[in-house]
Amino acid sequence: MTRLQRLFRIAWVFCRYRLDTFLPLSELPTPLKIFFLLAPWHLFPQPKLSRGDRLRLALEELGPVFVKFGQILSTRRDLLPDDMAESLKQLQDRVPPFPSEQARGIIEKSLGAPVSELFAEFSPDPMASASVAQVHAATLPNGQKVVVKVLRPGIEKVIRQDLGLMYLMAGLLEKYWSEGKRLHPVEVVADYDSTIHDELDLQREAANASQLRRNFENSPLIYIPFIDWDYTRKSVLVMERIHGIPIADVPALEKAGVNMRVLAEKGVEIFFTQVFRDSFFHADMHPGNIFVDVSNPADPKYIAIDFGIVGTLAPDDQSYLARNLLAFFRRDYRQVAQLHIQSGWVPPETRVNEFEAAIRTVCEPIFERPLKDISFGHFLLRLFQTARRFNMEVQPQLVLLQKTLLNVEGLGRQLYPDLDLWSTAQPFLEDWMRKRIGPSGLIKSLQNHLPSWLEQSPEMPQLVHDALLQIRSSGPTEAQNRATLALMKEQQLRSERRWRRGFIALVLAGAALVGSQPHAGQWLADLPVWSWALLAGAAGVMLRGSR
């Protein structure tokens, strides 16, 4: 299908479901007004469905690329009204499987050998089929039971074509719709572009799975299947076959005698462990991707699959998020506002008092509920919606995190309705903050950064000299040069004094921490030579800088 044919197909579906009623025709420029007035809307009576259901059915009819886009939009309640977001949550990826002969051809081309040589057994009937790939059961020559994920043929071309049209429509909305500049539709499509292209590379998914498996090796919380890298390529992924009960099958879990409270609390612990310990989290934890190992019903274990979408948080984002959540539950709305400004999530010129008042208006009603009924995910959602009114830039990593948290909460309360997320999460957050900003955190930071500082310190005089020469040659008057040089020297001296004081404070904190340990003397004697060398080098830099 050509791009023009596809565009007409999209327009036809829009007409069929009367999506014209969503558009602010009065705000459109004259050419677009004429187009919409001449379009054959009158041939289609308005369906007796809610606007959310009409949008959902239209996206399903347009195919897998639009379905996936709708699924992502369902988590963006800062962009869509609640009723439409709820309807989009029901979107189903209804894609028929492609013939097994095609799957075999892709496997043989990718792995360079016949399927009969690669596998002792290969099921021609797919276990599951989705928009991007389908999965077959197989057995390796060594007897290992595996699943083989095969990329759908031609999917890259389909995605490229539909994304081009999405960018076109988003660009028109951003240019001609009054809300377009605030909601950044082009940015939304760009985020989706990045997400869906990540899913097209099965080697990337395999790498994500390997990282998560390493992070949770021997963990009692969750099991990640191993990847067979000898059989994995960009279009083919071979992974250990797992056995468990789907987490959404609550009757089966109850019949197996699973402790539902423990299972729900483990889900919360898994989420916070990924976000704050590892800064690497499975960002597609919907019920279809989670199973439960019930071999020990009193202490059940999660099993995760489908690692195409993962999220990461920078250390600063981790810190601001943890401090935001802790400040929220202390009802310290001023700190919440200040943290948003300090993090750069909202512009620095934002008025703290106004922002604090807006946050209070949103958050106070939440505290009228029992703690067990407070939703972290909806808190973040309402907070981001409020921040958008103050020109908060879209933070893709936080959008992924909020979506994942909503999934985790939904699962947890489906399993155990009285789940109190705060009592489960608070100790984790407070412990993480103590480790990050306490003496041990300072010493760890010093250990990580001191070698780099020592390596760069010999270059500092030359850098300062070069900067001064550049100022001298830039053309100001001699008096201006002298004033600038004097100011720079004073700033340099102040910086050196602060650096020395900070270093001394770190050493004293480290000494206090070491001194509090049993057998401190023996511990110091056992320190490796390189540790003493680093400390001696740092002291030398201090003495040299103090002259």
Curated annotation (Swiss-Prot):
Keywords: ATP-binding, Cell inner membrane, Cell membrane, Kinase, Membrane, Nucleotide-binding, Transferase, Transmembrane, Transmembrane helix, Ubiquinone biosynthesis
CDD domains: UbiB
Location(s), subcellular: Cell inner membrane
Keyword Coiled coil on entry: no
A GO term for molecular function: ATP binding
Membrane topology: Multi-pass membrane protein
The EC number(s) this enzyme carries: 2.7.-.-
Domain of life assignment: Bacteria
Boundaries of every Protein kinase domain copy: 121-501
Chain sites annotated for binding ATP: M127, A128, S129, A130, S131, V132, A133, Q134, V135, K149
Catalytic center residues: D284 (proton acceptor)
GO-annotated biological processes: regulation of ubiquinone biosynthetic process; ubiquinone biosynthetic process
Entry GO CC: plasma membrane
InterPro entries: ABC1_dom (IPR004147), Kinase-like_dom_sf (IPR011009), UbiB (IPR010232), UbiB_bact (IPR045308), UbiB_kinase (IPR050154)
Transmembrane annotation, as ranges: 502-522, 523-543
Pfam families: ABC1 (PF03109)
Pathway: Cofactor biosynthesis; ubiquinone biosynthesis [regulation]
Similarity-based family: Belongs to the ABC1 family. UbiB subfamily.
Role noted for this protein: Is probably a protein kinase regulator of UbiI activity which is involved in aerobic coenzyme Q (ubiquinone) biosynthesis.
Annotated PANTHER family: CHAPERONE-ACTIVITY OF BC1 COMPLEX CABC1 -RELATED (PTHR10566), PROTEIN ACTIVITY OF BC1 COMPLEX KINASE 7, CHLOROPLASTIC (PTHR10566:SF113)
Protein name, as recorded: Probable protein kinase UbiB
Native source organism of the sequence: Marinobacter nauticus (strain ATCC 700491 / DSM 11845 / VT8)
Gene name for this UniProt entry: ubiB
